[in-house]
């Protein structure tokens, strides 16, 4: 059974994807010599296709990520989302730093999403790398801060607040259609002390 993060599970995978998941570098070397292009997506199922490097990042397979990069995989290509965002959720700071150069190309919404990815992946250790890449909590962390408060994640909420998250962030979205702030979200939350 092959698991690729939250993307899905498969009993079998195409040859290249299986070699990546099995860390079969010998098989990949043979495939590369036979003309494998690491910059072509692999169809995993009817609706899911991923780049080879993307599979390794989703699996947080650091040696395979390095292998694929050393063999010419383009870090700027991804089917799901920019690899910096995937790494922020699925990997540690070492891998996030590999893709930090993508920060300059991200839209403001994608930069906000970076902190949501940190929250979803429970990877607060990646915040420092994102900030060093120019994606700062004080400018882009408000959405993740409000969500962390709403779900009672006091550790992440405190960390984001200490790093300058906007306590008054109140843009509406699908989860918070009434444009609530973190403070109004904290009031009914039993994890945060009242008083």
Feature locations, PLM:
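Ankyrin repeat domain, specifically the short helix-to-loop turn at the C-terminus of the second helix
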Residues: 30-37, 66-74, 97-105, 128-136, ...
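Core solenoid repeat modules with strong leucine/isoleucine-rich periodicity
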Residues: 85-96, 100-102, 109, 113-121, ...
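Ankyrin-repeat helical core positions
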Residues: 5, 20, 32-33, 57, ...
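Ankyrin-repeat boundary/"N-cap" motif
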Residues: 6-18, 41-54, 77-86, 108-118, ...
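Conserved ankyrin/ankyrin-like repeat signature
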Residues: 27, 63-64, 94-95, 125-126, ...
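Alpha-helical segment of the N-proximal tetratricopeptide repeat
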Residues: 15-22, 27
């Amino acid at each position: 059974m092959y698991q690729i993060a939250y993307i899905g599970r498969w009993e079998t995978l195409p040859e290249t994807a299986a070699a990546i998941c099995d860390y079969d570098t010998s098989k990949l070397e043979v495939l590369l010599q036979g003309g494998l292009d690491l910059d072509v997506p692999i169809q995993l199922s009817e609706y899911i296709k991923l780049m080879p490097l993307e599979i390794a990042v989703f699996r947080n397979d650091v040696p395979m990520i390095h292998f694929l990069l050393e063999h010419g995989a383009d870090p700027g290509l991804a089917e799901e989302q920019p690899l910096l965002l995937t790494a922020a959720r699925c990997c540690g700071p070492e891998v996030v730093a590999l893709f930090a150069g993508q920060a300059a190309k991200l839209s403001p919404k994608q930069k906000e999403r970076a902190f949501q990815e940190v929250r979803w992946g429970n990877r607060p250790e990646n915040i420092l790398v994102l900030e060093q890449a120019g994606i700062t909590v004080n400018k882009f962390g408000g959405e993740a801060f409000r969500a962390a408060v709403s779900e009672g994640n006091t550790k992440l909420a405190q960390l984001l607040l200490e790093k300058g998250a906007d306590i008054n962030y109140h843009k509406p979205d699908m989860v918070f259609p009434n444009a609530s702030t973190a403070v109004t979200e904290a009031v009914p939350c039993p994890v945060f002390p009242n008083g």
